[in-house]
Curated annotation (Swiss-Prot):
Its EC number is 7.4.2.11. This is Methionine import ATP-binding protein MetN. Pfam families: ABC_tran, NIL. It comes from Xanthomonas axonopodis pv. citri (strain 306). GO terms for molecular function: ABC-type D-methionine transporter activity; ATP binding; ATP hydrolysis activity. It catalyses: L-methionine(out) + ATP + H2O = L-methionine(in) + ADP + phosphate + H(+); D-methionine(out) + ATP + H2O = D-methionine(in) + ADP + phosphate + H(+). It is a peripheral membrane protein. It is an enzyme of class 7 (translocase). InterPro entries: AAA+_ATPase, ABC_transporter-like_ATP-bd, ABC_transporter-like_CS, ACT-like_dom_sf, MetN_ABC, MetN_ABC_transporter-like, NIL_domain, P-loop_NTPase. CDD domains: ABC_MetN_methionine_transporter. Belongs to the ABC transporter superfamily. Methionine importer (TC 3.A.1.24) family. Transmembrane segments: none annotated. Keywords: Amino-acid transport, ATP-binding, Cell inner membrane, Cell membrane, Membrane, Nucleotide-binding, Translocase, Transport. ATP binds at residues 38-45.
Length: 335
């Protein structure tokens, strides 16, 4: 368990106090993949770097388990950092070392015997699919391969927590998907707690269990990804979701003016996503429908669907009751 208790961070610049992170309270459960999303300057990198005290907090407390990280001395901090791995946007690999040498580096710093290092490096390169690249140098690798080396290096000391600082931002979409699949596999197989920061809601949707949304250094929304993604409350969250779904809300509302009837958003979650609920209820209630927008996808392993439909004729109240009885969430957009 990682607990932020009124943790905050400020800087002094030319005699002025700049607040990077306002006091916040947050809990991240053991074994979770927890996402932190925000635009540039929102405070997300500051937040993740407070966990291993690469940034020193200005106040508040940070607990990992029962240990108060904010109270650790230098020796305690070194021990903590061996339990926390970190991967970076631009990989931070040592260009003069081979792939195997980069993965071995934290073990060498820890004084691990050579035989153990060699065995651990071989194990980790197999895990990230780079066995055949052990003797290559970073300059000979693709971006995705470099990030896999970074992941292997971060796992070298068998950490309990893995911090991912914009780990996919420098990668193309296909490589991003493969790296996210690898992180999800590591989470499942090793039970690591993963804290991932990004400015892309699609990354959150694919891999995270819960998410926190930061805006101008403030925590504005948090919750399970299914809830936050499908029913965003804060304006910043709604913008992120619209960008992920490639929906122009203003354009969509202009389209509403061209159609009559009651406009609703229907949200299907789980196996019900694939059931012919809309057609059945239309037949039962005499309601006609016009689909204005639709999407079927997955949030991590959970299928979901969203339709925006215009309903005309028939019994609207009976239709709404039928949707609710079928487990479909109904949001009135225009009555």
């Amino acid at each position: 368990m990682i607990q932020f208790q009124r943790l905050h961070k400020s800087y002094s610049v030319d005699g002025r106090q700049i607040v990077a992170l306002h006091p916040l309270d947050l809990r991240i459960g053991p074994g979770e993949v927890f996402g932190i999303i925000g635009h540039s300057g929102a405070g997300k990198s500051t937040l993740i770097r407070l966990i291993n005290r690469l940034e020193e907090p200005s106040g508040g407390r940070l607990l990992i388990g029962e240990e108060d990280v904010t109270a650790l001395d230098r020796q305690g901090l070194r021990a903590l950092r061996r339990r926390i791995g970190m991967i970076f946007q631009h990989f931070n690999l040592l260009s003069s070392r081979t792939v195997a040498g980069n993965v071995a580096f934290p073990l060498e710093l820890a004084g691990t015997p050579r035989a153990e290092i060699d065995a651990r490096v071989a194990e980790l390169l197999a895990r990230v699919g780079l066995q055949e690249h052990a003797n290559k140098y970073p300059a000979q690798l693709s971006g995705g391969q470099k990030q896999r080396v970074g992941i292997a290096r971060a796992l070298a000391t068998r950490p309990q927590i893995l911090l991912c600082d914009e780990a996919t931002s420098a990668l193309d979409p296909q490589t991003t998907a493969s790296v996210l699949q690898l992180l999800a596999q590591i989470n499942r197989e090793l039970g690591l707690t993963i804290v991932l920061i990004t400015h892309e809601m699609d990354v959150i949707r694919r891999v995270c269990d819960r998410v926190a949304v930061l805006d101008a250094g403030k925590l504005v929304e948090t919750g399970p990804v299914t809830e936050v993604f499908l029913h965003p409350k804060h304006a910043t969250t709604r913008r992120f979701v619209s960008e992920a779904e490639h929906v122009d809300e203003a354009e969509l509302h202009r389209d509403f003016a061209a159609v009559g009837g009651r406009i609703v958003r229907l949200t299907f979650l789980g196996n019900g996503t694939y059931e012919p609920v809309l057609g059945r209820i239309a037949r039962e209630t005499g309601v006609d429908y016009n689909i204005l927008s639709g999407r079927v996808d997955r949030i991590k392993d959970t299928p979901y669907g969203q339709l925006i439909v215009a309903l005309t004729g028939g019994d609207h109240n009976a239709a709404r009751a039928g949707f609710v009885a079928a487990g479909v969430q109904v949001e009135e957009l225009r009555v």
